[in-house]
Curated annotation (Swiss-Prot):
Chief place of localization: membrane
Protein name: NADH-quinone oxidoreductase subunit N 2
Taxonomic source organism: Herpetosiphon aurantiacus (strain ATCC 23779 / DSM 785 / 114-95)
Transport among keywords: yes
Organism superkingdom: Bacteria
Gene: nuoN2
A Pfam family reported for this protein in Swiss-Prot or TrEMBL: Proton_antipo_M
Amino acid sequence: MNFQIADFTRLIPEFLLLAIAAMVLLGDVLTRWSKGKEALNDRTEEAISMTLMGLGLAFVMVLIQGGFFSWMQFGDWKFYDFSIFQNLRSSGLDGSILGGAFVVDPLTHIGRLVFIGAAFVTVILTSKAKPSNNPAEFYALILFATLGMIFMTAGGELIMIYLGIELTSIPLYVLAGYFRRNPVSTEAGAKYYIFGALSSAILLFGMSLLLGLTLMNGQTMTTTPTSLRSVATAVELAFANPEGPSQGVAILALLFILAGMAYKVAIVPFHAWSPDVYQGAPTSMTAFISTASKTAGFFLLYRVLVTGFGAPSILGTAAIGTSTSFGGWTSLIAILAALTMLVGNLAALPQTNAKRMLAYSSIAQAGFLMLGLVGTQRDSGISLLMYLIAYTVTNLSAFGILALVEDAVGGTDFSNLNGLGRRAPGLALLLTVAILSLAGIPPLSGFFVKFYVFIAAWQEGAKWLVIFAVSNTVISLYYYLRFLKAVYFAPAETDEPIKVGFGPGIVMTAITLLIFGLGIVPTWLYGVLEQATIRIAAQ
């Protein structure tokens, strides 16, 4: 793995996140000698400010580096023009650096923006429910997890992918159980760690099989044996010779990798950890885990499946871009998608806790997301990426508002939401928009991305799955509407107004406007996502 000077400039956002995390920790060390509650508050505010500043700077750097800004000439003046229709080219034709281990392509830029944005919102949400001790470690862990998610999305070879998964997972295990005086939070962290460690072991075993497959097929002569390109060549050779043992190894490796990743994104039957962890973790961290972490998992799954296992000979179908590609492992994805939608929706129906219900809702949403993986056509990839972005924004809004309600009333049961429409009309309106978007009600983003993913899956030939998904959408309306019943029609124990801080209120309002924007004018995102799918299909 060769590191060149040009690679440094392409990794500036990652170096920024690492530097800010180090500065947050160092700054806390220099002020830790101060005692008392006031000194702790000062340390926390400093950590929050530095983290937000670093995330904001990294976000702007990604915009500039990704080609979202371009110089425009106006007479004798030059100025920056914000343009998201640029063809993102920041790392050459093949988009890979560090010997192909890190891929800088449109998908990486999109992932950077999504993860950094989600981390920024999460830090804002924690500004009221601050950690009671060691604040610097808390916010540094958020930065490290964000960095790991970027590595997951940009990983072009198996070792980098695994390092990204662990760099994401380990900080999240700690953050889920960070409030040690709360036994529910501690239990959530322990369960998350146990299930996560098991999934990492399963995933690592699948990767070891892929490494053996590439070595078995002699792929070390021209490329790194752990690169996804080597994996793709070795798997294609294995399927070209069905009489040999290589095909069985390739299938077994794929099954282990799917199982390991299914744990990470809570796909049935590997979903059991999700409700307990989501309910027990601090609500602000639940928002981060359920959105950014799951999105990173799906980004990784998309890259690995399309790049490593997307050859027509593996699918047993026509070439990409010429006909449907529904077959082979995509049939397994379709079955898992159907099970995930059904189990998630049915389990959500009897829930009395809003966080736990949204946890099962997130499982069902993972099933809908998997419709974008039932084929390798370009439209399937675009619909998946659009759904992921809309899901991240919407779920972040829903859990974020629950975090604000919990700070005010001390719980997240449906009884705690009773009368919210009278106690905090603005907050109730924002929650309503998020819930209706999750339910797929037009003109919100949730409706349009579901429509796109249904159309793409139908074109791939998975007609039965689309019909099943539409039926599950109808089922989900029941438990989503329970939110509105509690917010607007259930009597509250008190009519005391709920006050929300200026910062969290502005951020939640901005996210709600984005939910509308992605729904009313979804085409503005299409061009960037199209470039992402083109580059991945070409790798």
